[in-house]
Amino acid sequence: MNRKQKRLAVIAGGMGFIAAAVLLVMFAFSQSVAYFYMPADLAKTPVAPETRIRLGGLVGEGSVVRGAGSTVEFSVTDGSANAVKVKYTGILPDLFREGQGVVTEGMFAPGTNVFTADTVLAKHDETYMPKDVADRLKQQGLWKEGQGGQESPGKEGQGQENPGEEAKATQ
């Protein structure tokens, strides 16, 4: 090999290495991404079973049913007629209650319309509404003035009196 061919081989090998690294990073991110949905979104476009998503909204009034052990079933609603039944096994945050803003993460069980959550997030203030949920309610025209009690913070911790008081429960 002459000098020109060696240089071409090194450049081609380097580009191949970079392409492989980019593909591996893209694959890793695609496996860990959980898209955010509200019940109205799921009514329009169902999600394939065993696809990991985040489901946000309000815990439906009168929907919390405690089962055997630490299993809890409740509905997540977005203020419209749409509601999604959620099943969670684990310890719920102390601040979890009906009418509270909640974000759950998990997937739909195959062959059912039940969302099986493995993470439940609830916020400290009864007037707090997660930013994603508040934005979606505004888009759908379901937002009521005074709901949420505050403007959605632009950055984590801004606009909250006690930003560290987020409750998280993970199985």
Curated annotation (Swiss-Prot):
Residue spans, topological domain Cytoplasmic: 1-7
Compartment annotation: Cell inner membrane
Residues where heme binds: H124, Y128
Residues covered by region (Disordered): 132-171
Protein's GO biological process: cytochrome complex assembly
Topological category with respect to the lipid bilayer: Single-pass type II membrane protein
Highest rank taxon of the organism: Bacteria
GO CC terms of this entry: plasma membrane
Transmembrane parts of this sequence: 8-28
Chain segments annotated as coiled-coil in the UniProt record: none
Periplasmic side: 29-171
One family name in Pfam for this protein: CcmE
Keywords from the named record: Cell inner membrane, Cell membrane, Cytochrome c-type biogenesis, Heme, Iron, Membrane, Metal-binding, Signal-anchor, Transmembrane, Transmembrane helix
Disulphide connectivity of cysteines: none
GO molecular function: heme binding; metal ion binding
HAMAP family: CcmE
Family from the record: Belongs to the CcmE/CycJ family.
Record-linked NCBIfam families: PRK13254.1-1, PRK13254.1-5
General function of this protein: Heme chaperone required for the biogenesis of c-type cytochromes. Transiently binds heme delivered by CcmC and transfers the heme to apo-cytochromes in a process facilitated by CcmF and CcmH.
Descriptive protein name: Cytochrome c-type biogenesis protein CcmE
Source organism (scientific name): Rhizobium leguminosarum bv. trifolii (strain WSM2304)
